[in-house]
Amino acid sequence: YAIVARPRF
């Protein structure tokens, strides 16, 4: 996964 502030990815 990528380092992001998303609830779903």
UniProtKB/Swiss-Prot annotation:
Residue runs in coiled coils: none
Gene Ontology process terms (BP): neuropeptide signaling pathway
Chief place of localization: secreted
Record's GO cellular component terms: extracellular region
Keyword RNA-binding part of the UniProt annotation: no
Keyword Secreted applies: yes
Keywords: Amidation, Neuropeptide, Secreted
Protein name (Swiss-Prot/TrEMBL): Peptide tyrosine phenylalanine
Organism annotation: Loligo vulgaris
